C-alpha cells in the first residue's frame, strides 16, 4: 500500500503544478487496503480537502491503482481519524474542583457543550454524595448545581447563536469570536485568522476561490484574448488598472474561470490579501439575512474591507433594490480604498433590466469586455487540453468533428467529451469519429434541430427591421445588403450548411458571395464594437 502511494504521489507531483500538489496531494495518506475486496482507503486531513480531492482526483488515483495492482480498485476517501479526535473520557469523573474550567466563549472541539456536560456530571456526583449526608444536603447540592448547569447551557446557546449568525451570513469560516477578532486586527500583509496551521486551506475556504482555475489552464483564442489580457493586467495591478473590470458573455464561456484566475494570482502574489468570490445569488441571500438579524454592521465591515471582490452573474440583482443599495455602498467603499472589483454578467451592463442607473454608471466607469463563443480552432484546443487533463489521448480528427458540431460554449464541449469518454470506456472501444457519433447521437440531433438558416434569416430580418423576403432578393441598398451579409455569416457559424447550400437559401447566390460576406463580417467584428455587440445579441437570441 505504501509502495503504491509513493508511486502515485511521484506521478501526481510531475503532473500537477507545485501549488496543486502541495495543497491537495501531499496532505493525503493511505490508511487501509483490503486485498479481498479490492478497496483502498485514503485519508484527508479535513472535510474541505476530502470533498475537493474526491471530486477532482479520484478518477486518476483509481486508474493508477488499477495499473499498479492489475485489477480495478475501489478508492475510498475518508476523514483522517486524527482530525476528529476528542480527549478521551476519564475512567471516573474528577471532582469539580480538579477539572479545568473551559475558556470563556470556547468553541473548539467539544468544548461548546463541555460546560453543560461538566455541570450535569457534577450534579449527579454531588447528589450521590449527598445521600449519605442527608436529604436536605442533597436537595441543596442539586439546586446549586442545576443552576450552574442552566447557566452553562445558556452560555453555550448564546455562543452557538453568535456562531450561527456569522455562518448564516456566509462570512469567513471562523467562529464568532475569531471572525470578530480577524475583522478588528487584520493588517496588510497578514492573513486574517491564520495561525500557520492549514493556512492554505483557510485562505481558500475564506476566499471561496477554486484553486484549479488559473491563467495557466485557461485556453486562449480570438474570442477571449482581450478578456484574458485585461484580467492579467488587473491581477498585476489590482485597484489601479480597470476598476471595475466587467466581463460579460453567454453561459460557459470562461467568465468564472477568469475571475477565479485573477483571485488565485493575487493570493499568490500578496500574502494575506482579503479576497472574496461570491455568486450574486449568495450576496442577495446575505443581504436578506443581515436584514433579518439586524447584522448590517458586520456585513458592511466585512465586504467594505476586502482587497478584491469577485462577484459572479450580477444580473441576479435585477429588481432587488435593497441588495443594489448595499452593493452600491460596498462598491464605493472598495473603490475609494483602491480595492479591486470584478463583475461578470450574461449581458452587456446597459441591457441588464431592473438595475439602478447609479450602478450601471459605476459598471461603465471601468473596462467592459465581452467574451465570445470560441471559434473552431479554440474549440479544438479546449477539447485537446481537457482530454490531456483526463489523461486520455484524443485524435485531432475527433476533436475537430466535435468542435464543428458543438459551437456554443466551453461547458457544452467539456460535457460532450465526458460523454464520449464514458461511452468509450463502457463499451471498451477506441475513441473514433464513429464512436463519437454514437456517443453524441442525441446531442447532435438536438443541435441540428435547434438552429436553421430560415430561423437565422427571420431573426436577423426582425432585428434590423427589414422583410424576410429581402434576404432572398437581389436588392442591394446598404440597409438590406448589410443584414443579409450578417445572416450569411451567422448561417456559416451556427449551422452545418456548406457555402453553396447557404447561397442557395439566400436566393440562389454563388458560394463566393457567401464566402465574401462571411470574411467581411468576421473581419469587421474584430474591429467594430457595435457590430460585435449586435452579433452577440443575435447569437444569444438564436441559441435561446
UniProtKB/Swiss-Prot annotation:
Q: Which SUPFAM superfamilies match?
A: P-loop containing nucleoside triphosphate hydrolases, TrpR-like
- Domain remarks in the Swiss-Prot or TrEMBL record: Domain I is involved in oligomerization and binding regulators, domain II is flexibile and of varying length in different bacteria, domain III forms the AAA+ region, while domain IV binds dsDNA.
- Which gene codes for it? dnaA
Any Gene Ontology CC annotation:
plasma membrane
Q: Name one GO biological process term.
A: regulation of DNA replication
Where does the record place the region Domain IV, binds dsDNA?
Answer: 425-544
Binding-site residues, ATP: 252, 254-256
Q: What is this protein called?
A: Chromosomal replication initiator protein DnaA
